[in-house]
């Protein structure tokens, strides 16, 4: 049987005019800023806040295979299922980054019959938010280098500039560069480097801001580097926060699109969860809560990364409690964690599913530690067998875990009704949500709590550089920030080959980064990179554009 590609399905779908999608959730035309017929930005100042805001359902996953486990697909499909049940629902997603689109994963707008549209636009340039973020980030780099070139009144030590340039592409050759070469007219030579745009602090700030004023305040607090006597230098010292916020004045507005089934979707912001906080914008989530009774959103990778940061950073900053959490599992990921090689994942292997269930079990238990009841969604793939699925269901029943087989890729919203009904039962019950740690804990204790309670590790080792940074950060008054762990998504540990549910391992913190604008401290583990590289055969090799301007091979 031949299956249509995601792009073919998207191209065969009939989109509703964006003004009709907006009207379905009470967005007036004067609050809508259309970008063509099927996309728009929303003027949040023209949305009336609700007293009884919508309930937030978070979708996370077990530790993924390199291809991903369909978290975005389940997120969209679950929202469509609520729509099918006549619930007032919106879905809130992150924007895809071009780097992974051309790299290993292809597009990131869901899949099959559970997609947000227009898929081509969203995956490529969308409404220009990433370009604005990239421009603001690199404008700050230009302002820093110009300040040094023009006399360096602030006494910035060019050896201790923390701010890097960014690009929305996987490009390992740009990790370490020299700038200012070519003589005195070209600036002061120094070492620099590039991160991917989704790792930019500007991206994190946009996603954690509540208004333009809040955006400007957060930008002003960015630490760009240090003086020669090691005092922090901020954007406020450079006096360019207004200019940077101006570049972002449209990017801060949430983007409205739709699913194949016409469910309204806000797609806004896109930090990675392995190197940043991995959640869409607070503004999009809160706008959806003002418009809908249920908001389905996602956080990147597994509960150890995106979900932990959603709870400890985003929900804490926004001041809401998630009403339920869906943990996406796949038979292929369970088999991978049970020791099956990538080439054999399509073959039935119930014993491997049994061995790999420990990974899912830890993710389920992690969610319970935040005081929220998890619901497992088995995202169905065509190679799954009845015996494999039945084992997972029996495990769930034995352990009193809610579970539903989810077939939204093939059937759209109808394939997610069982999952939606399970989630509805959970959100109708009170929960006891609480973040994992108190902000008053010292930074090293917050990190240890995440490593021991969420990852299952036994010990944290800090490099000599990280130890010096801990001391310096305390002296600078940065000890009360939450922690954003930068770690491989493939394992609970910092070794991506250690699958399943390892325990007793040590995590090494090699370096810390102070994101004082966004308001968190990044702890870098293992060999994690903030500028990824492309694989030997990037997804770009399968992409093209027709003579009439339509994309080919975009997932």
UniProtKB/Swiss-Prot annotation:
Reaction it catalyzes: (6S)-5,6,7,8-tetrahydrofolate + formate + ATP = (6R)-10-formyltetrahydrofolate + ADP + phosphate
Gene Ontology MF, one: formate-tetrahydrofolate ligase activity
Pfam family name, one: FTHFS
Organism superkingdom: Bacteria
Claim: Secreted is one of the keywords in the record: no
Example GO BP: tetrahydrofolate interconversion
EC number, UniProt record: 6.3.4.3
Record-listed ATP binding positions: 65-72
Keyword entries, A-Z: ATP-binding, Ligase, Nucleotide-binding, One-carbon metabolism
Gene3D superfamilies per record: Domain 2, N(10)-formyltetrahydrofolate synthetase, Formyltetrahydrofolate synthetase, domain 3, P-loop containing nucleotide triphosphate hydrolases
InterPro entries given in the database record: Formate_THF_ligase, Formate_THF_ligase_CS, P-loop_NTPase
Enzyme class, broadest EC rank: ligase
Pathway: One-carbon metabolism; tetrahydrofolate interconversion
HAMAP family: FTHFS (MF_01543)
Membership in a protein family: Belongs to the formate--tetrahydrofolate ligase family.
Protein name per UniProt: Formate--tetrahydrofolate ligase
Gene name linked to the record: fhs
